A protein has these predicted regions:
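Hydrophobic alpha-helical segments and their helix-loop junctions in multi-pass secondary transporters
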Residues: 161-188, 192, 205-221, 386-395, ...
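Extracellular/periplasmic helix-exit of transmembrane alpha-helices
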Residues: 65-77, 217-225, 254-284
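Juxtamembrane transmembrane-helix boundary signature
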Residues: 29, 56-89, 97-111
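Hydrophobic transmembrane alpha-helices that form the core helical bundles
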Residues: 73, 77, 95-126, 133, ...
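Transmembrane alpha-helical segments of multi-pass small-molecule transport proteins
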Residues: 99-100, 124-146, 162-171, 340-354, ...
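Membrane-interface "cap" regions at the ends of multi-pass membrane proteins
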Residues: 1-37, 93, 222, 229, ...
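Loop-to-transmembrane helix boundary motifs in multi-pass membrane proteins
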Residues: 92-93, 130-134, 296, 300, ...
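Flexible loop linkers connecting adjacent transmembrane helices
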Residues: 2-8, 41-44, 69-94, 119-121, ...
């Protein structure tokens, strides 16, 4: 982020701070991963294949933690977001290509999430879904532009609680826990195009480029908000700060994967068990639950769609704005007044409004989401490669090179995503 960095000997990441206070960028990033588009993907996985894709949560968790840790470390150690570091250390053509693909994918995701949120309100209380979509868009945009950063982050933290709705759904249905445990540890693979495509979609939903940009930039926001310096300039703070990042990321990604597990589990034990196997939207999943699992499950699922959408929209729009601002060296911070960072907030508004506009076109939301997943997958691999290179580049991180275990897991995560992209194109 291009803004003044203040100095202080006080370290808010020190051991005497509360455990909950250590949760911030990682928690919000992990929760935002379970957006309405992700909910639709996990719902389809459970509805179509029952318990047989629960194992993916066990695989993606350590990989997701590793790559998000790399992202967070780059931001906190260097004092700059991913796009700024790419601009400073890599060819412009590579940066421009990555950012354009990110903008396209994020805008389509915003459109899909807004539509799902409007449909969820319609399911719960009736009325015009499109009017709800517009209203929710306006509320989200107003919060992003006019609410001060520290208060805004507290709002996002509270919104993560809505994800427990998907845990609550489990208590409304009967779960064969022994079978669940068996299928999670010993899954039954199906070498079919549908199985591979859904598997790729789950990987692509779980490990997404916008999460990389958001968490790195949020670490810089936290650095500035607490009047700290980057670790390359203040190495004495590294133990406490990197420890806080570890806790935050491990908990945040764990939260994300637990919720994903419960969404797959809920739809498997309800929809799949009743031969409802074609779920294409989150709202459709909520609607299908009602006659099978009852009003409570339906209500919790619907509320979850709205809450996760409100959490994910600022992450999608914000990561697009951070990437553009970092690319061109603009002022960028949610802590800055909109008048002081007009272009940064302009991108947030533009991405959100264009996403809303797409909902009033003939664009097929399911096809749009599919191609968004393709773009996300294609974009994530080169970004992950560049992140792993930055994490070991002394020009970026100084002496804070990623440790061996993190490098191994980071490259493994990159290899899994590359294989997923290859499989995606193989079955297109």
């Amino acid at each position: 982020m291009e803004r003044e960095i203040y100095t202080s000997d006080r370290n808010p990441d020190s051991a005497d701070t509360s455990w909950l206070s250590k949760l911030g960028p990682g928690l919000i990033t992990g929760a935002a991963d379970d957006d309405p588009s992700g909910i639709a993907t996990y719902s389809q996985a459970g509805a179509q294949f029952g318990f047989n894709l629960l194992w993916t949560v066990l695989l993606t968790y350590p990989l997701m933690v590793a790559i998000q840790l790399v992202s967070a470390r780059i931001g906190r150690v260097s004092g700059h977001g991913l796009a700024t570091n790419l601009r400073r250390h890599y060819p412009p053509s590579l940066l421009y290509g990555v950012v354009i693909l990110l903008l396209v994918a994020n805008t389509i995701n915003i459109a899909a999430d807004l539509r799902a949120m409007g449909a969820a309100v319609n399911l719960l209380i009736g009325g015009p879904a499109r009017a709800y979509t517009v209203a929710l868009c306006a509320i989200s945009l107003t919060l992003q532009i006019f609410v001060p950063y520290r208060r805004y982050v507290r709002v996002l933290k509270w919104l993560t609680l809505v994800l427990f709705a998907y845990v609550g759904v489990v208590f409304a249905v009967r779960i064969p826990w022994s079978t669940v445990a068996l299928r999670t540890i010993l899954p039954q693979f199906s070498p079919s195009a549908d199985y591979i495509t859904t598997l790729v979609a789950v990987f692509g939903t779980t490990i997404s480029p916008y999460l990389f940009f958001w968490q790195a930039s949020q670490e810089v926001e936290e650095l500035n908000a607490t009047e700290q310096q980057p670790l390359v300039k203040k190495p004495a703070q590294s133990a406490a700060t990197l420890g806080r990042i570890r806790v935050d990321t491990v908990v945040g990604m764990g939260f994300s994967n637990v919720i994903a597990f419960f969404i797959i589990l809920t739809t498997a034990v309800t929809l799949h068990a009743h031969h409802v196997t074609d779920i294409q939207t989150a709202a459709q999943a909520a609607s299908a639950l009602k006659p099978i699992a009852g009003n409570l499950a339906f209500f919790l699922f619907g509320v979850g769609i709205i809450g996760t959408g409100m959490l994910a929209l600022p992450v999608l729009a914000g990561s697009a704005a951070y990437s553009m601002a970092g690319t061109f060296g603009w002022k960028n911070s949610l802590a800055l007044d909109a008048q002081l960072a007009k272009r940064f907030y302009g991108i947030i508004a533009l991405a959100t409004i264009v996403g809303l506009a797409l909902d009033f076109t003939s664009l097929d939301p399911i096809k749009a989401l599919f191609w968004s997943a393709v773009i996300n997958g294609v974009t994530s691999v080169p970004i992950m490669v560049l992140m792993m290179l930055m994490a070991t580049n002394p020009n970026v991180v100084g002496t804070f090179v990623a440790p061996l275990t993190l490098r191994i897991l980071g490259w493994l995560s990159t290899a899994v995503m590359a294989a997923a992209v290859f499989a995606m194109f193989l079955f297109l």
